[in-house]
């Protein structure tokens, strides 16, 4: 049975780290990773040039700074942050499993997710990115919202395509 990595938000740090660690240590070959509005770059917590419309709902830059500071035990944005803590810090993203990323257009993590998807694609990793306009961080929790139902449908279809061709 194919092994699939799936997690949302800050939990993605562990998911993306597991994919990197497995690749680096010749661990299990994951068939697919599904990253839901992933929190993968500590540098977002200290950026001053963020788009003014992102990060205003649910997960703010202040929350993000606290989260990264708590995880790292030091200032986010330092030069020596491990890619196993912040996957966007990986120098090499080749050899990672096919990846599906879903993120809202108002999510604080939008820009880091777009950049990570671009890096994966340039490294030859099959990647599918869905950006849901006007959706904020955590929108999957609004289970009856049309955008959430669409995102869940898109996820199921991507999983089917990645696993069954």
Question: Each predicted region: which residue ranges?
Answer:
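Alpha/beta-hydrolase superfamily serine-hydrolase fold, recognizing
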Residues: 1-165
